[in-house]
Swiss-Prot record:
Its cofactor is FMNH2. It catalyses: 5-O-(1-carboxyvinyl)-3-phosphoshikimate = chorismate + phosphate. It comes from Sulfolobus acidocaldarius (strain ATCC 33909 / DSM 639 / JCM 8929 / NBRC 15157 / NCIMB 11770). PROSITE patterns: CHORISMATE_SYNTHASE_1, CHORISMATE_SYNTHASE_3. This is Chorismate synthase. Its EC number is 4.2.3.5. NADP(+) binds at R48. HAMAP family: Chorismate_synth. The gene is aroC. InterPro entries: Chorismate_synth, Chorismate_synth_AroC_sf, Chorismate_synthase_CS. Pathway: Metabolic intermediate biosynthesis; chorismate biosynthesis; chorismate from D-erythrose 4-phosphate and phosphoenolpyruvate: step 7/7. One of its GO terms (molecular function) is chorismate synthase activity. The keyword Coiled coil does not apply. Reduced FMN (FMNH(2)). Belongs to the chorismate synthase family.
Length: 391
């Protein structure tokens, strides 16, 4: 099964299944000398961890173990391997799924491609969103390296079902939404999201949503024309997330309904004396290259496919139509935890391109660089907590 790797100079390869003994990721291309700890990785994992209110009841601790590529707390330049053991597995909940593929899931396509006898039906196997914990673990390394370019990434749930944020929101509010149980950037929005989720849970149904990711201080010129454009790699990374059904940046699909005079952004001299764009309608990307403005992109998540409502399917034992009610532990809105995954994927793409463009040394960090990264990382971990508590 190829297709488990992403990136060129900063390359990740994930492995493992939802109900296997572990999942994990191999990260190749990490410069030597970076301080990295279990706690750094746990910090990022904590925001997508299941078992919280409004998400899956599967209670995984998500404790990462660094098993290669680090010595005395610093990267060696060798491939860095992280494993996360699966501890809260109840495969018996999926016995019916073994014979009745779930509507909206990858079950039937996997059976058709790899064969029924080779299909790991337990929790979705390799197609499960459980795999994304490995990506988030790798993103901790990516985000630390991006401290060298002062790039900071924030993400929030812009809409859930029929409820959508229709007012301006600051980058700070977006950044701090990671402390909201539903990844809302406004308190009123959080309350409306929670109402929707409670309603869906009672009805045995689910909701879809849209995650918005903002990256500030993105270096100019990231992207390699023509097939490795920044937008192309971001689209690939975000569309690889389970349940993501759409991607846009800047004006996105709205631009298709505009005139050129409306969609074009005026070039101006900014307050700092540098050239820039008046409104950032392009979302930080023009010609497939980052242009120095904030990176603004969105990805749409479909509703969680595993729902308790009866749905039509086929019993593979009898080849007759049947029904199924999925009784496992599932998110009423996969988009909530998907926000953290979308943020992680953007970090992975940006660090890969930053290495390719020479903004980050590819072989070894200097002592000053390693120290600066560590200092900025500590501020990143601590800085938004007081603001969140005051909201």
């Amino acid at each position: 099964m190829p297709g488990n790797s992403l990136g060129k100079m900063f390359r990740i390869t994930t492995f493992g299944e939802s109900h296997g003994p572990m999942i994990g990721v191999i990260v190749d291309g990490v410069p030597a000398g970076l301080y990295i700890s279990k706690e750094d990785i746990e910090f990022e994992l904590s925001f997508r961890r299941p078992g919280k209110q409004f998400v899956s009841g599967r209670r995984e601790k998500d404790e990462p173990e660094i098993v290669s590529g680090v010595y005395n707390g610093r990267t060696t330049g060798a491939p860095l391997t992280i494993i996360i053991r699966n501890n809260d597995v109840i495969s018996s909940l999926y016995e019916e799924v073994k014979h009745k593929p779930r509507p909206g899931h990858a079950d039937l396509p996997y059976i058709m491609k790899y064969g029924y006898e080779n299909w790991d039906y337990r929790g979705g196997g390799r197609s499960s969103a459980r795999e994304t914990a490995s990506r988030v673990a790798a993103s901790a390394i990516a985000k630390k390296l991006l401290m060298l370019t002062d790039t900071v990434i924030g993400a929030h749930l812009k809409s859930l079902g029929p409820v959508e944020l229709d007012e301006d929101v600051s980058f700070r509010e977006i950044f701090c939404s990671k402390y909201s149980p539903v990844r809302a950037s406004k308190k009123w929005l959080e309350e409306k999201y929670e109402e929707l989720i409670k309603q869906a849970t009672v009805e045995g149904d689910s909701w879809g949503g849209v995650a918005e990711v903002i990256a500030d201080n993105v270096p100019i010129g990231l992207g390699e024309p023509v097939f490795d454009k920044l937008k192309s790699d971001l689209a690939k990374a975000l569309l690889s997330i389970p349940a993501v059904v759409g991607f846009e940046y800047g004006l996105g699909f709205k631009a298709s309904k505009m005139k050129g005079s409306e969609a074009n952004d005026e070039i101006v001299i900014k307050d700092n004396g540098k050239l820039g764009w008046r409104y950032n309608k392009a979302g930080g990307i023009l010609g497939g290259l980052s242009n120095g403005e904030k990176l603004v992109l969105r990805c749409a998540f479909k509703p969680t496919s595993s729902i308790r409502k009866p749905q039509k399917t086929v019993d593979l034992r009898t080849s007759e139509e049947s029904t199924i009610r999925v009784i496992g532990r599932h998110d009423p809105a996969v988009a909530i935890r998907g926000v953290s995954v979308a943020e992680a994927m953007v970090a992975l793409v940006l660090v890969d391109h930053a290495l390719r463009s020479g903004y980050i040394p590819p072989v070894k960090l200097s002592e000053d660089q390693a120290r600066i990264i560590e200092e900025k990382w500590r501020r990143y971990v601590e800085e938004c907590k007081p603001m969140q508590e005051s909201q």
